[in-house]
Amino acid sequence: MESLCGVLGFLLLAAGLPLQAAKRFRDVLGHEQYPDHMREHNQLRGWSSDENEWDEHLYPVWRRGDGRWKDSWEGGRVQAVLTSDSPALVGSNITFVVNLVFPRCQKEDANGNIVYEKNCRNDLGLTSDLHVYNWTAGADDGDWEDGTSRSQHLRFPDRRPFPRPHGWKKWSFVYVFHTLGQYFQKLGRCSARVSINTVNLTAGPQVMEVTVFRRYGRAYIPISKVKDVYVITDQIPVFVTMSQKNDRNLSDEIFLRDLPIVFDVLIHDPSHFLNDSAISYKWNFGDNTGLFVSNNHTLNHTYVLNGTFNLNLTVQTAVPGPCPPPSPSTPPPPSTPPSPPPSPLPTLSTPSPSLMPTGYKSMELSDISNENCRINRYGYFRATITIVEGILEVSIMQIADVPMPTPQPANSLMDFTVTCKGATPMEACTIISDPTCQIAQNRVCSPVAVDGLCLLSVRRAFNGSGTYCVNFTLGDDASLALTSTLISIPGKDPDSPLRAVNGVLISIGCLAVLVTMVTILLYKKHKAYKPIGNCPRNTVKGKGLSVLLSHAKAPFFRGDQEKDPLLQDKPRTL
C-alpha cells in the first residue's frame, strides 16, 4: 500500500513539473503549433527551433494587458512597424524590416541614445536634460568585457552571447523574429532588417511575429510587439500596366479603337532571383489575332473592333531548383529460362553497357546533374478590357487675329480653327501657358456642339504681347485628345490711334495749302494782258470802272494808295 501511494505521489509530482518548467520560445513568442514534418521541411538557415528555453530572468515575459507595458518607455508607447517585400517566389529571398516609432519629440542620436528633439522640447515643458535614455554614459568598460560576471547580461534570450561587430555598443535593442516554429535573434538600433531564403518553404500565407526589447539596467524589458502576414508562392508574381494615348481613364480598363495599347509586364522580384533567367511572354488578346510570343516585357497591340475582350498572359521561366529523386531501378520480372541455343554464343556472356540495369545509369546521371537542375515556373495574368470609339486626333487648322472696332491695347483676340478625327467631342478646354508649356496662366473649358465634320472655331483672349503656349483638349466620356502650339502676340502702342488721326489731319492740311499755292501761281501765269484802246466809249467805260474799283478797294487797301498816284487826282473835264 505504501509503495502504491509512493507511485501515485511520483506521478502527481511529474504532472506538476511542466507547470514550473522553464518557458520555451514558442510559449513566449506565439502559439502556432507546427508538426515535426513541417519544421523539418521549412527549416530556415541560421534560425533555431522555438523548442529552446527562454531566459525569463534576463528577458521578462509580459502578457497582453499587463500594466507594466504602460511604464516600459518614458513619455509614451513605442510602436513597431513591420513590413516585407512579400509575395516571394519559392527559392527567392524575402526581407523583413522593423522600424521603431518613438513618442513625440523623441529620436535616436548617433550614439544610439534616445534624446529629445530641440524644436519641440519647450512645448512639452521638459527639463534641461536632452536625453530620454543615455545608455552609453551609464555603462562602464567592464560591462562590455567578455567572460566577466558584469557582462553576463550581454546575451540573447536563449543565452547566446551578443556578437561584437564594430559599433555594437551603440545597439540597445534586441529583436526576436519568430515564424514557422523557428526564431532569429538580432541586436540593433531603432531599425532591424532580416532576410530569409524560401527554397525550403511551403507555398502559402505565413505569419511573422517580432518582439522588441530595450536595455533596462542589466536586463531587457519588452517595449513592443508586432506581426504581419507574408506570402510564399510557386507562381511568378505578375502585374500588367496598360496605357494608351488619348485614353481618359487608365484604371477603368476601357480603351479606344484604332489606337495602340501599350502592355508593360511588371514582375515582382525584389531579391533579383530571376535576373539570370530567360523569361518568355505569351499573349492572347482575345480578338482572334492568334498567340504572340515575345522575350520583351513590353508589347503594343491595336484593337480594330468595338467590344469586350479577354486578355490572357502566361509568363514562363526556368529557375534553379532541386533535382527530382532518382527513380528506383525496377528488377526484371521473373521468367522461365530460355532454351539453350543450338550453338554457344560467347558474345552474350559479357553484358554490354546497353544491357546494364537502368538504375545504375539513372543514379549516375542524377549525381552529375544534381547541381544543374532547373524548374519551370509560371506566372499568369488575366483581364477583361472594353474597346470603344474615341477621339483619335486633334489638329489646329488656322489661327487668325480678330479685328477690334475699338482699340484695346491690353487684350488681343485670336480665332483658332480646330479639327478632330474619330468620335464627336463634347467638351473643349484651352490652357494658355508660358512658352515652355509648364506654367499655366489661364484655363477655360466649355461644352461644344460639333457637326459630323468635327470642325469648330474657338476664340481666346491674350493678356498683352509675348509668346504663349496654347493647349487645346477635346474630350468625351472615354477619350481626351490634345494638341499644342506656340503663338506670338505682337505689341500695341496705346497712343497709336491718336497719332494716326493727327497724322491724317496734318497731311490733309498740307495738301490743301499746296493746292492753293499751285492754283494762284497758275492763275498769275496764264492771266491775259489787255491795253487801253482809243475808242472814247471804251475809255469812258474803262475809266468809270477803274474809279469804281478804286473806291471799293479804298477801305481795305489804304496803304497801297500811294503806289498809284494817278488815281489820287479827281477826274476833270477836258
From Swiss-Prot:
- Membrane-spanning ranges: 503-523
Q: What is its main location?
A: membrane
Tissue note: May be up-regulated in bone metastatic breast cancer cells.
Keyword RNA-binding listed? The answer is no
One of the record's GO molecular function terms: syndecan binding
Q: Which residues lie on this side of the membrane: Cytoplasmic?
A: 524-574
Q: Which residues lie on this side of the membrane: Extracellular?
A: 23-502
Biased composition, class Pro residues, residue ranges? 321-345
The record's subcellular locations are: Cell membrane; Melanosome membrane; Early endosome membrane
InterPro entries per the UniProt record, alphabetical: Ig-like_fold (IPR013783), PKAT (IPR045219), PKAT_KLD (IPR046846), PKD/Chitinase_dom (IPR022409), PKD_dom (IPR000601), PKD_dom_sf (IPR035986)
Please give the residues the UniProt entry marks as glycosylated.
93, 134, 200, 249, 275, 296, 300, 306, 312, 463, 471
Question: Its membrane topology, per UniProt?
Answer: Single-pass type I membrane protein
Segment forming the signal sequence: 1-22
GO CC terms: cytoplasmic vesicle; early endosome membrane; melanosome membrane; plasma membrane
In the record, Phosphoserine modifications are located at 546
Q: Does the keyword Cell membrane apply?
A: yes
Q: Describe the location of the PKD domain by residue ranges.
A: 250-338
Q: Which UniProt keywords apply?
A: Cell membrane, Endosome, Glycoprotein, Membrane, Phosphoprotein, Signal, Transmembrane, Transmembrane helix
**Region spans: Disordered:** 320-353
Gene3D superfamilies documented for this protein: Immunoglobulins (2.60.40.10)
Q: What does this protein do?
A: Could be a melanogenic enzyme.
Q: Which family does it belong to?
A: Belongs to the PMEL/NMB family.
**Protein's name according to its UniProt entry:** Transmembrane glycoprotein NMB
Q: Which organism is it from?
A: Mus musculus (Mouse)
Gene name linked to the record? Gpnmb
